[in-house]
Amino acid sequence: KEMVDDYLNYCLSTQLDDKTAEAVQIDNSFYMHGKQFYSNGYGMSMFRDMSFWIYILRETQFSIGQEVVTRMGNYMLNGTSWTIRGDIIELYLGYRPYKFDVGYQNYAEEYIEPLKRMITADPSRANEYQKVLNNIQNPTESNGKNGNYYMWRSGYGAHMKDGYGVNIK
C-alpha cells in the first residue's frame, strides 16, 4: 500500500513554489517540457489515468488517500474546467485526431469517462464534476462557470458567464 501511495502522490504532485517543474501548478494548470502550458495535453492524460486509479482502487486496501483525490478535483474543477466550453477545449494542440465520428468537434470527449469515474469516486464534489460533464455532453448557454479565473503560473485567463466565454493566453 505504501508503495502505491508514494507512486500516486508522485504522479499528482503539485508545484507549490516558483521553480519550473513538470507537474500540476499551484494555480491548477499543468506544465510539461519546462514552462509550457499543457493542461489539455499531458494534463488531460494525467487526469484520465489518475481518475482510473482513484476509481478502480476505491473501497480496497489500496484506495487513494483523500488528499490526492482533492488535488485531482482541484486540478479539474478549479483549473482545467475553465478551459472547456461545450465540446471546445481552448488551447488544444490538435496532435491527435478529433472525434468527428462520435459527434464531437474537438477533444473534450476525452474527459467524459474520467469525469464519470470522479463523480463516483469523489462524491463530495460529484455535483461539480457533473456540471463539467453536462457542459461537454449537452452544451447549453452556461458551462457552469460565472466569473474570472487566471492561471498566473501559465499566463492563461478565462472569463465565463451564461451565453459568453472568452479565454486568453
What are these regions (language model features)?
Residues 1-169:
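Extracellular polysaccharide-recognition and catalytic grooves
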